[in-house]
């Protein structure tokens, strides 16, 4: 079996030459007469340039085919092969990676499992982020959770910045919030997921994740790009960690934002996350607060859903843009809001209710024009943020 990778080069770069350099340099490493006696042995490991196309802007996309036998069915060896040292060679960007269906680690829970655990099948899920990100005590987290959970929230997560800090140690946050989750379940019959941020050194992370699950965590959050894809793979493959893992995109810009270098966002936040075992992946929405290419966003959405991974467009999501989100995503999406819920003029519970009012108006085909909105949480949100 083979792995296909697309590299995009600016007009000033000799794409044919660079593609051949990658095909040989990132596989056998050399292909000279000195090694002719090993030709048959080396041939099976050699990459091959299989096509080059020119785009309208003069850029060229070279497609290189790599033997799958060169890698270990994981993301680390894959990235080392397809871009490794060549990532330091100058202009040239990985814009597509096409892997066999069986490559890597599949989501353990995914879209279907998350919906089953919540008992919600016919609408988008609504998710919040604890805010302020830092400075809240463990009990503060529980108080906020109680307010938004009883308003109907499906999922809440730690802010990615919230590590295992003295102000609110991870296990204390979980202990306080777990009581609220049980209270909500007993009084309403509803389950709410709390994605606890797993942090620490590599030799501690898996043990900490197991302990969190053992002590009642029903979801985990991981900053995959700062801790490494190998950590995600280890957590996703661990039978003792039987909860959904929400993958955060922190640091993705350092890998992907360059126009002619690095890897495309759809490769890192789509293909790699989907083949490393994430159950849900957060990433910026094009109409949110961070600049993001709508084409890349669409690719990420489709790549994730093809492998039963929940897309979670984020950063600036607010009730007033729910029609646009659903127009792009349909119902299989998680609406993830931080300030769009926590900074609602009437409080976080009203922030949650505003999202559900938005979903109800879309279902009914009603207008979002403030002049046509009844007084309530949604109208307040739209007047505040548009």
From Swiss-Prot:
Q: Which cofactor does it need?
A: Mg(2+)
Q: In which pathway does it act?
A: Amino-acid biosynthesis; L-methionine biosynthesis via salvage pathway; L-methionine from S-methyl-5-thio-alpha-D-ribose 1-phosphate: step 3/6
Residues that, per the record, bind substrate: 131, 157-160, 248, 316, 338-339
Quickly give the catalysed reaction. 5-methylsulfanyl-2,3-dioxopentyl phosphate = 2-hydroxy-5-methylsulfanyl-3-oxopent-1-enyl phosphate
Annotated CDD domains: RLP_DK-MTP-1-P-enolase (cd08209)
Biological process (GO) annotations held by this record are: carbon fixation; L-methionine salvage from methylthioadenosine
Q: What class of enzyme is it?
A: isomerase
What SUPFAM superfamilies has UniProt attached to this entry? Answer: RuBisCo, C-terminal domain, RuBisCO, large subunit, small (N-terminal) domain
Which cysteines in this chain are paired by disulphide bridges?
Answer: none
The note on the cofactor says: Binds 1 Mg(2+) ion per subunit.
Keyword Amino-acid biosynthesis tagged: yes
Query: What GO molecular function terms would the record report?
Result: 2,3-diketo-5-methylthiopentyl-1-phosphate enolase activity; magnesium ion binding; ribulose-bisphosphate carboxylase activity
List, alphabetically, the Pfam families matched. RuBisCO_large, RuBisCO_large_N
Q: Where does Mg(2+) bind?
A: 157, 159-160
**Additional notes on this entry:** Has no RuBP-carboxylation activity.
Q: What family does this belong to? A: Belongs to the RuBisCO large chain family. Type IV subfamily.
Subunit comment for this entry? Homodimer.
Protein's job:
Catalyzes the enolization of 2,3-diketo-5-methylthiopentyl-1-phosphate (DK-MTP-1-P) into 2-hydroxy-3-keto-5-methylthiopentenyl-1-phosphate (HK-MTPenyl-1-P).
PANTHER family named among the record's database cross-references = RIBULOSE BISPHOSPHATE CARBOXYLASE, RIBULOSE BISPHOSPHATE CARBOXYLASE LARGE CHAIN
Q: What is this protein's name?
A: 2,3-diketo-5-methylthiopentyl-1-phosphate enolase
């Amino acid at each position: 079996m083979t792995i296909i990778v697309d590299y995009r080069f600016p007009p000033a770069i000799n794409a044919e030459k660079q593609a051949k350099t990658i095909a040989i340099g990132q596989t056998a490493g050399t292909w000279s007469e000195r090694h002719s006696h090993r030709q048959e042995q080396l041939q099976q490991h050699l990459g091959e340039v299989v096509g080059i196309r020119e785009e309208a802007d003069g850029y060229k996309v070279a497609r290189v085919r790599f033997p799958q036998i060169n890698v270990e069915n994981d993301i680390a060896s894959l990235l080392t092969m397809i871009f490794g040292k060549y990532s330091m060679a100058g202009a040239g960007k990985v814009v597509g990676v096409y892997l066999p269906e069986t490559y890597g680690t599949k989501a353990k829970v995914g879209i279907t499992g998350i919906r089953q655990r919540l008992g919600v099948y016919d609408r988008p899920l609504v998710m919040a982020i604890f805010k302020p990100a830092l400075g809240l005590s463990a009990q503060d987290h529980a108080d906020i959770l109680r307010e938004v959970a009883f308003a109907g929230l499906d999922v809440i997560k730690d802010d990615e910045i919230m590590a295992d800090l003295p102000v609110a140690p991870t296990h204390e946050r979980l202990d306080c919030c777990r009581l609220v989750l049980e209270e909500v379940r007993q009084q309403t019959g509803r389950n709410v997921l709390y994605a606890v941020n797993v942090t620490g050194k590599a030799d501690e992370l898996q043990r900490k994740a197991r302990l969190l699950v053992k002590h009642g965590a029903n979801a985990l959050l991981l900053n995959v790009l700062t801790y490494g894809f190998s950590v995600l793979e280890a957590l996703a493959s661990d039978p003792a960690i039987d909860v959904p893992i929400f993958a955060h995109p922190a640091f993705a810009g350092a890998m992907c934002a360059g126009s002619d270098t690095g890897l495309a966002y759809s490769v890192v936040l789509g293909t790699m996350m989907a083949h490393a075992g994430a159950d849900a992946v957060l990433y910026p929405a094009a109409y949110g607060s961070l600049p993001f290419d709508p084409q890349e966003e669409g690719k990420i959405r489709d790549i994730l859903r093809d492998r039963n991974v929940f897309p979670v467009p984020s950063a600036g999501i607010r009730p007033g843009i729910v029609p646009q989100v659903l127009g792009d995503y349909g119902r299989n999406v998680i609406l993830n809001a931080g300030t769009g819920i926590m900074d609602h003029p009437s409080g976080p519970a009203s922030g949650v209710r505003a999202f559900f009012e938005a979903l109800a108006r879309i279902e009914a085909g009603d207008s979002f024009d403030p002049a046509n909105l009844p007084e309530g949480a949604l109208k307040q949100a739209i007047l505040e943020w548009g």
